[in-house]
Amino acid sequence: MKTLCYIVLFFGATTSLAQQTLEQVLLKYNKQSIPYISAEMLAEIQNDPTIILLDSREKKEYEVSHIKGALYAGYEDFDLQEVSKNIKSKDAQIIVYCSLGVRSEDIAETLQKAGYTNIKNLYGGIFNWK
């Protein structure tokens, strides 16, 4: 019985250490180079026809589910020229998302380097979207 208690305590402790909060993950993997937009704020402005919503996940992820109105941008196969065809103005309001907000920051940085000026990263990505 004593051994069983130690095993349970050991696995319980290692599991809790392995779990990180979303904030910890984003602080660890992101540079915070792109401002975030909350899921709540996006929900308020989502129907604005001037907003461009880009899904930076892989094609299979996009095909399974995506936020209504989002355009597929991809990550590994991201093509700036292809995406630029759908964004006429460098000042357009662009919101990029992925699963959590890590890949989307990379894509947003690429867009920023290409001269786009009004980009936000969906905090928590599609997993935080309700």
Q: Can you say where each PLM-predicted feature lies in the sequence?
A:
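Positively charged n-region of N-terminal signal peptides that target proteins for export
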Residues: M1-C5
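Catalytic cysteine-centered active loop of the rhodanese-like fold, especially the PTP/DSP P-loop
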Residues: F78-K130
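Flexible, polar/low-complexity N-terminal or interdomain linker segments that lie immediately upstream
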Residues: Y6-I52, K59-E63
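Short loop/edge segments at beta-strand edges and connector loops
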Residues: S38, G74, Y123
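Short active-site oxyanion
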Residues: I45-L53, K68-G69, A92-I94, T117-N118
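A glycine-rich, hydrophobic loop/mini-helix early in the fold
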Residues: I52-Q81
